[in-house]
């Protein structure tokens, strides 16, 4: 199964499509989302300042029919299938789960404790604390009353789940992002299985020019301090110190080389330097 998969799960009207759209799913005008959302898959391309990657957002819903009032028992039945041997490939391919709750729904609040109990089972089936993925509970509501959000947050965090109140904005007193920004940040900071670096072309060019200039010293007898090159301010100080140390060791090794061997070695070192910058 392809890498970079996230499951968005919840009962009807729990904000699954809203969460998917925030992550990056696009909904065309031809789509009919009035029925069950089970089986919807959105394949998107995400890009941040540092990387870009493909992502599959897989949406699922319980119960199977919208004519049935959802309850924690339906989630439990869903989890039995999810934890079955037939679903092992899916579980292994998941990078994360976003579980959505509609806090305006009285049944949702009534079923909160057994619902989170089922989520704990699902989490353990993925490997628990050893699982490299993320598991977030996302709450939506139309009410300005935050009491239900506080109740769900307490129940979630005490069991080790992150809770995101999708109606919040800005930052908390610890300068942590809230609401939509936190959901996006969760995806931006995850260690995805399959990514490509995404850097500004101008910055990348400056890095290569600086690396080429530094590595030219391996071919020269110039003892000028290599840390004086223009462009040093473009990189982290600690990273740059690692680069300088690597170049010093490379200079010593290059002294025993001549001609083509020395040129080839300088090229190899330059590529290594680029990985540091």
UniProtKB/Swiss-Prot annotation:
Record GO terms (molecular function): protein-macromolecule adaptor activity
Keyword NADP in annotation: no
GO biological process: vesicle-mediated transport
Family (UniProt): Belongs to the IRC6 family.
Gene3D superfamilies according to UniProt: 3.40.50.11960
UniProt KW Phosphoprotein keyword: no
Protein name from the UniProt record: Increased recombination centers protein 6
PANTHER family on file: INCREASED RECOMBINATION CENTERS PROTEIN 6 (PTHR28043:SF1)
UniProt lineage: Eukaryota, Fungi, Dikarya, Ascomycota, Saccharomycotina
Function: Involved in gross chromosomal rearrangements (GCRs) and telomere healing.
Keywords assigned by UniProt, alphabetized: Chromosomal rearrangement
């Amino acid at each position: 199964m392809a890498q970079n998969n996230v499951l968005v799960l919840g009962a009807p009207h729990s904000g699954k499509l809203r969460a998917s759209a925030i992550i990056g799913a696009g909904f065309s005008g031809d789509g009919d989302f009035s029925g069950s959302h089970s089986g919807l898959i959105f394949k998107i391309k995400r890009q941040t300042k540092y990387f870009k990657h493909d992502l599959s957002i897989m949406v699922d819903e319980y119960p199977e029919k919208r004519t049935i009032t959802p309850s924690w028992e339906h989630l439990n039945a869903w989890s039995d299938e999810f934890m079955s041997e037939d679903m092992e490939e899916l579980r292994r391919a998941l990078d994360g789960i976003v579980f959505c709750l509609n806090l305006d729904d009285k049944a949702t609040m009534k079923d909160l404790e057994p619902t989170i109990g089922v989520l704990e089972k699902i989490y353990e089936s993925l490997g628990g604390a050893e699982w490299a993925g993320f598991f977030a509970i996302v709450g939506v509501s139309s009410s300005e009353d935050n009491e239900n959000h506080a109740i769900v947050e307490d129940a979630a965090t005490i069991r080790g789940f992150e809770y995101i109140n999708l109606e919040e904005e800005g930052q908390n007193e610890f300068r942590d992002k809230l609401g939509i920004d936190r959901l996006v940040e969760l995806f931006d900071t995850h260690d995805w299985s399959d990514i490509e670096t995404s850097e500004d072309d101008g910055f990348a060019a400056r890095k290569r020019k600086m690396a080429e200039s530094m590595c030219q010293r391996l071919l020269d007898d110039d003892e000028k301090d290599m840390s004086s090159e223009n462009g040093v301010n473009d990189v982290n100080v600690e990273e740059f110190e690692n680069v300088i140390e690597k170049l010093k060791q490379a200079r010593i090794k290059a002294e025993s080389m001549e001609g083509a061997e020395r040129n080839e070695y300088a090229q190899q070192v330059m590529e290594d330097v680029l990985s540091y910058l």
